[in-house]
A protein has these predicted regions:
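Thiamine diphosphate
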Residues: 1-169, 173, 308, ...
Length: 326
C-alpha cells in the first residue's frame, strides 16, 4: 500500500503524471503549463519529462485551447486543458456548451469527447478581478458535461484519474485556496464512483452538504457545534453534475434538517437545486426549511473585502442555529 501525505497541488501533479505515463494519447494543454509548470505549479516538471508534444504551451486564447482539444479528442486523443483562472473560462464557454457538451448527442452516440477542462476556482487568495470566481453552476446546468470538485488530496488524485478515463467531457474545478492543504493519499486504493457523495462526518441532528473549498469550513463548523452538544453530519458532494441525491436524501431523512453550503452566490446556485430536490423527495421528513449559505449576488469584491464576501464559519454556524431553532 503506497500511502503518502501530500498537498492537493502535489496530488494533482502526480495524477497528471500517471495519466501521461500510462496513456500516450493523453495530452496537457494550456497557458504556461509547460516551461513554467502552470501559475500554481500543478504541471511542474511534466513538459521536461514528457516533452513539448504532450505538454503544450498555448497562446492566450481560451476558445482556441478548448476548440483544439475538441479536435484532438475527435482524433482519438484525451486532452487535459488548463484554464489558468476561473474568470478566464468565459471566452471558451461557447466551445464548451455548443460543441463539447453536445457533439456526442448530435452524432447519436457515435463519437466520444474525452476532454478534461481544469479550472482553478474560488476566492481566498487575495487576487484581482477575474481570478476568484465560482462559476460551477453555469456548467452544471449544461447537459452533457460532468462537473466535479475535490476537497482533499486523495480525491484530487483519484478524481483526476477518473476524469481522464471518462469518455464524457469533465469540467474539473480545483479549489485554489486549498491547493496547499495536505492529507494522506493511498495511490493503491480502489476509488468510489466519480459522482458519488461521501459522508466525511457522521451526525444525527442536521446535515451540512458542501463541495470543494467549503467542505473544510463545514467540518470546522461541525466540530464547533459539537462543543455545544449538536451532532452535525457533513457530506462532501464531490460532483455537481450529476448530483448524488440518494446519499443526500438518506442523510436528510436521518437528521431532518439540511443546510447547503457553497462559495458561489446563493442566487441560482447549486444549493437551490439540492434544496428543491430534497424538498420534493423528503418533504415529510424535514423538521425545518432547507437553508443555503453562499456568496452574495454581487460581483466578486476587491481582495480587501473578500473575507466579508466569502461564507465562513460564523455564517455556517448561524444557519445551523436557525435550522435547529425550528
Amino acid at each position: 500500500m503506497a500511502v503518502e501525505k501530500m498537498s492537493i497541488a502535489k496530488a494533482l501533479n502526480e495524477s497528471l503524471r500517471h495519466a501521461l505515463d500510462t496513456d500516450p494519447k493523453v495530452l496537457i494543454m494550456g497557458e504556461d503549463v509547460g516551461k513554467l509548470g502552470g501559475v500554481f505549479r500543478i504541471t511542474d516538471g511534466l513538459q521536461k519529462d514528457f516533452g513539448e508534444d504532450r505538454v503544450i504551451d498555448t497562446p492566450l486564447a481560451e476558445s482556441g485551447i478548448v476548440g483544439t482539444a475538441i479536435g484532438l479528442a475527435l482524433r482519438g486523443y484525451r486532452p487535459i486543458v488548463e484554464i489558468q483562472f476561473d474568470g478566464f473560462v468565459f471566452p471558451a464557454y461557447d466551445q464548451i456548451v455548443t460543441q463539447l457538451a453536445k457533439m456526442h448527442a448530435r452524432a447519436l452516440g457515435k463519437i466520444k469527447l474525452p476532454v478534461v477542462v481544469r479550472i482553478p476556482y474560488g476566492g481566498g487568495i487575495g487576487a484581482v478581478e477575474h481570478h476568484s470566481e465560482s462559476p460551477e453552476a453555469l456548467f452544471a446546468h449544461v447537459a452533457g458535461l460532468k462537473v466535479v470538485s475535490p476537497s482533499n488530496a486523495s480525491d484530487a488524485y483519484w478524481m483526476m484519474q477518473q476524469a481522464v478515463q471518462s469518455d464524457d467531457p469533465v469540467i474539473f474545478f480545483e479549489p485554489k485556496r486549498r491547493y496547499w492543504d495536505k492529507s494522506e493519499v493511498d495511490t493503491d486504493a480502489i476509488p468510489g464512483p466519480l459522482h458519488k457523495a461521501v459522508t466525511v462526518r457522521e451526525g444525527s441532528d442536521l446535515t451540512l452538504v458542501a463541495y470543494g473549498p467549503m467542505v473544510k469550513v463545514c467540518l470546522e463548523a461541525a466540530a464547533a457545534a459539537q462543543e455545544e452538544g449538536k451532532s452535525i453530519e457533513v457530506l462532501d458532494l464531490r460532483s455537481m453534475s450529476p448530483i448524488d441525491f440518494d446519499t443526500v436524501q438518506a442523510s436528510v431523512e436521518k437528521t431532518g434538517r439540511l443546510v447547503v453550503v457553497h462559495e458561489a452566490p446563493v442566487f441560482y446556485g447549486s444549493g437551490a437545486e439540492i434544496a428543491a430536490r430534497i424538498t420534493e423527495r423528503s418533504f415529510y421528513h424535514l423538521e425545518a426549511p432547507v437553508l443555503r449559505v453562499g456568496g452574495y449576488h454581487a460581483p466578486y469584491p476587491p481582495a480587501r473585502l473578500e473575507e466579508e464576501y466569502l461564507p465562513g464559519l460564523d455564517r455556517v454556524l448561524d444557519a445551523v442555529d436557525r435550522s435547529l431553532a425550528y
